[in-house]
């Protein structure tokens, strides 16, 4: 009997456990599995990786089994998402925050896989991209409140995410009327004189030029300022968890935008510059603009926009609010010209008399009473940022295939900028449509130089082999290399050598087009003034360093000599002399001032041109001149292309004129002249008085006067008189009173 009871209990527990693993987490996730790996062990590994010095110890390893497969994660701290000036701001302080709990990696042995997440208290939370789709890992208590669970985390596949509002009449972004009101408001911005000409200049049409590949660093990174309100903090519980969520969202959109070719503009990335966390303690803070519980989505965006965000490309607020009509996010739409808003927009005055920054947006993780899966929230964030980048909602059959009657097109789903939220499980859900790419390309072309920065991170596809890359031949439309995978290949494969290839020409000139090292006799670098030609060594694609030419070899057009392979010495040193500067104080003309001059060591009085008789035994009468632009005349001027020394006047012509007029020497010279030639000054004074008296006498008889006792003025002789044609004699009319005339004039 006891045995039967135990058997029944055991079967019940197994059945219950199996049912629990198959039950949905909420109405959006229909299947999950539990994870119960050793959290203490992972926490210790995280601490070791955090303190690691060696390259090998910096990697964090996590192994577990779920969904019928094994996950062997190899991860490393991710520093690419946070700028060097990254700060975390709270109501009490601004902190230099440690982001060592943020990791990026891959599945060991699975090419093209990718993982990103955080390790907090020994638990991994994030997403894992595999060839079979993307898996999401989250803490179990976020969904299941039972503390007696035999697992601490849940993992589910993106195919098990079913978002019921994706094609419904509501959910996702705001409706057309909201965007129309926002568009009209954006048109009322008052331009300020501090704006750059690039911001004010309007383009006549799309300017979608293909960019040539360049090896110079591009401004391709949009720096973010992200705030979270007290409700967002309340849901996730800790500061570390909040930052992990922000990191996950930014990494998700970074992956989407980096892999999109915006008409030749590539590698667009994102970096967090500052985070403001409003905790539950800020709920009653009167300075907290987001403290009220019931704020509509438009007002919530307005509160974010009323702050000055000039230091950032974009500024977002993350919240946990259930907005009306299922809205998950809202943002100002950018434009290349004609209206305010979007990336790089500066604070300015608008029609309501308020200064606002319209480079803003908001995101919520709650919809219709339930928290949306991270996948949906990530796509929403990418969607709203797409608005900031200049894309309106997709429309037309070309850009909304999910509404097509063609089953093949409909199966691929809609693109990121579709008006309603998507679950992200369709092929097109993580891509931009051609309509969006055209719009975003115009805005990037116009505005990115106003606030985008260089990422400082290795970029696969820029033609330079950087850290973490084996080779770099560019993108698929640029790569002519048979040895290297181009930048359009998946993660773990791009910018890597193809199997069986020794090298790639992108690594250096000592690799052939057939992916083999050149022989030891082949030249890879021409000789220079101070270095011999470079010769390949047969074991590397890089061209080895060239041997230096002998010291005191002439270089730089015989004006200098080589020292240890560098053109760094003066030609004077070749003959045991020192270089000096010929100065005008020594009686040199402006042409000789641009000669190379030498002197005996410690004897400045011997300074003379190389063409002088004094140094004829060294230079054989050959005059060596300085290079155009070189300083001359004891650094008071520079040599022009005609080898003449042009003096430098830092003050400019206006300052010279001021000095000439107000110079004390000028007035001293005038005073001395007056003393010496007093009689001339006296004669000039008498002549001036007589001239003025004569002018008055002559002109007074022709000047009218109001004095009735004076005779009338005499007409000037020889003046032209205006002849008027004879007028017909008219009968005199009775003059109307002044009042009557004025009233008649007003009536007319």
From Swiss-Prot:
Residues carrying covalently attached carbohydrate according to the record: 267, 278, 439, 551
Disulphide bond pairs: 344-451, 399-435, 460-495, 471-484, 473-479, 483-515, 503-511, 510-536, 524-543, 530-562, 555-567, 572-598, 580-607, 582-597, 594-639, 632-645
Annotated positions of the Phosphothreonine modification: 719
Cofactor note: Binds 1 zinc ion per subunit.
Domain of life from the UniProt record: Eukaryota
Regulation: Catalytically inactive when the propeptide is intact and associated with the mature enzyme. The disintegrin and cysteine-rich regions modulate access of substrates to exerts an inhibitory effect on the cleavage of ADAM10 substrates.
Catalysed reaction equations from the record: Endopeptidase of broad specificity
Motif (Cysteine switch): 171-178
Compartmental location: Golgi apparatus membrane; Cell membrane; Cytoplasmic vesicle, Clathrin-coated vesicle; Cell projection, Axon
InterPro entries given in the database record: ADAM10_ADAM17, ADAM10_Cys-rich, ADAM_Metalloproteinase, Disintegrin_dom, Disintegrin_dom_sf, MetalloPept_cat_dom_sf, Peptidase_M12B
PTM comment, free text: The precursor is cleaved by furin and PCSK7.
Main EC class the enzyme belongs to: hydrolase
Signal peptide segment: 1-19
Residues under site feature: Cleavage: 213-214
Description of how the protein assembles with itself and partners: Forms a ternary EFNA5-EPHA3-ADAM10 complex mediating EFNA5 extracellular domain shedding by ADAM10 which regulates the EFNA5-EPHA3 complex internalization and function, the cleavage occurs in trans, with ADAM10 and its substrate being on the membranes of opposing cells. Interacts with the clathrin adapter AP2 complex subunits AP2A1, AP2A2, AP2B1, and AP2M1; this interaction facilitates ADAM10 endocytosis from the plasma membrane during long-term potentiation in hippocampal neurons.
Domain comment in the entry: The Cys-rich region C-terminal to the disintegrin domain functions as a substrate-recognition module, it recognizes the EFNA5-EPHA3 Complex but not the individual proteins PubMed:16239146. Both Cys-rich and stalk region are necessary for interaction with TSPAN5, TSPAN10, TSPAN14, TSPAN17, TSPAN33. Stalk region is sufficient for interaction with TSPAN15.
Name under which the protein is recorded: Disintegrin and metalloproteinase domain-containing protein 10
Gene assigned in the entry: ADAM10
């Amino acid at each position: 009997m006891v045995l039967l009871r135990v058997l029944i209990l055991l079967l019940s527990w197994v059945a219950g456990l199996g049912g629990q693993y198959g039950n949905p987490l909420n109405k959006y996730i229909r299947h999950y599995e539990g994870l119960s790996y050793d959290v203490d062990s992972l926490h210790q590994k995280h601490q070791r990786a955090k303190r690691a010095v060696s390259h090998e110890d910096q990697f964090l390893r996590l192994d577990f089994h779920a969904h019928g497969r094994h996950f062997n994660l190899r991860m490393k701290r991710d520093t690419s998402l946070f700028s060097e000036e990254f700060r975390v701001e709270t109501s009490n302080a601004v902190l230099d925050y440690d982001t060592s709990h943020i990791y990026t990696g891959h599945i060991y042995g699975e090419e093209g896989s990718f993982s990103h997440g955080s390790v907090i208290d020994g638990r991994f939370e994030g997403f894992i991209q595999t060839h079979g789709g993307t898996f999401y890992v989250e803490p179990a208590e976020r969904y299941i409140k039972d503390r007696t669970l035999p697992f601490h985390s849940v993992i589910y596949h993106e195919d098990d995410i079913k978002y019921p509002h994706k094609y419904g009449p509501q959910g996702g972004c705001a409706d057309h009327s909201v965007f129309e009101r926002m568009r009209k408001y954006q048109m009322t911005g008052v331009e300020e004189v501090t704006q750059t000409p690039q911001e004010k200049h309007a383009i006549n049409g799309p300017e979608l030029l293909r960019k040539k590949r360049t090896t110079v660093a591009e401004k391709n990174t949009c720096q973010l300022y992200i705030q979270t309100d007290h409700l967002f903090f309340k849901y996730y519980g800790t500061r570390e968890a909040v930052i992990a969520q922000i990191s996950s969202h930014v990494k998700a959109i970074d992956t989407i935008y980096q892999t999109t070719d915006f008409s030749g503009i590539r590698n667009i990335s994102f970096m967090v510059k500052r985070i403001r966390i409003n905790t539950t303690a800020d709920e009653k803070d009167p300075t907290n603009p987001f403290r009220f519980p019931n704020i509509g989505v438009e007002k919530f965006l307005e509160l974010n926009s009323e702050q000055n965000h000039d230091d950032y490309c974009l500024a977002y607020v993350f919240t946990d609010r259930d907005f009306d009509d299922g809205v998950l996010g809202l943002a100002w739409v950018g434009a290349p010209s004609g209206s305010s808003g979007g990336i790089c927009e500066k604070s300015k005055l608008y029609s309501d008399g308020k200064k606002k920054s319209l480079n803003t947006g908001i995101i919520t993780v709650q919809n219709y009473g339930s928290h949306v899966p991270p996948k949906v929230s990530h796509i929403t964030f990418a969607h709203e940022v797409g608005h900031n980048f200049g894309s309106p909602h997709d429309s037309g059959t070309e850009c909304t295939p999910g509404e097509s009657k063609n089953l093949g097109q409909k199966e691929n789903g809609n693109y990121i900028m579709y008006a309603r939220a998507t679950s992200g499980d369709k092929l097109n859900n993580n891509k931009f449509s051609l309509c969006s790419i055209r719009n975003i390309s115009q805005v990037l072309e116009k505005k990115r130089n106003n606030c985008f920065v260089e990422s400082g991170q290795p970029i696969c596809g820029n033609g330079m082999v950087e850290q973490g890359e084996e080779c770099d031949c560019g993108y698929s439309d640029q790569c002519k290399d048979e040895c290297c995978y181009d930048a359009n290949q998946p993660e773990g494969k791009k910018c890597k050598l193809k199997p069986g290839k020794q090298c790639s020409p992108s690594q250096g000139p000592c690799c052939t087009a057939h992916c083999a090292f050149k022989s030891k006799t082949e030249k890879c670098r021409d000789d220079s003034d101070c270095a011999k030609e470079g010769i390949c060594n047969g074991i590397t694609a890089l061209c080895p360093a060239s041997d230096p030419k002998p010291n005191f070899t002439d270089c730089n057009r015989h004006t200098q000599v080589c020292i240890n392979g560098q053109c760094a010495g003066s030609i004077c040193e070749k003959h045991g002399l020192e270089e000096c500067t010929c100065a005008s104080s020594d009686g040199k003309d402006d042409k000789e001032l641009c000669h190379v001059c030498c002197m005996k060591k410690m004897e400045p009085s011997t300074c003379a041109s190389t063409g002088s008789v004094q140094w004829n035994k060294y230079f054989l009468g050959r005059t060596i001149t300085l290079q155009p632009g070189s300083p001359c005349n004891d650094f008071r001027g520079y040599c022009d292309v005609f080898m003449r020394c042009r003096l430098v006047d830092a003050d400019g012509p206006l300052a010279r004129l001021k000095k000439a007029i107000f110079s004390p020497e000028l007035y001293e010279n005038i005073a001395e002249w007056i003393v010496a030639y007093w009689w001339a000054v006296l004669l000039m004074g008498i002549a001036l008085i007589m001239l003025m008296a004569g002018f008055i006498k002559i002109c007074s008889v022709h000047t009218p006067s109001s004095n009735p006792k004076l005779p009338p003025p005499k007409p000037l002789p020889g003046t032209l008189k205006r002849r008027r044609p004879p007028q017909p004699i008219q009968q005199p009319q009775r003059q109307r009173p002044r009042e009557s005339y004025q009233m008649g004039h007003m009536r007319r």
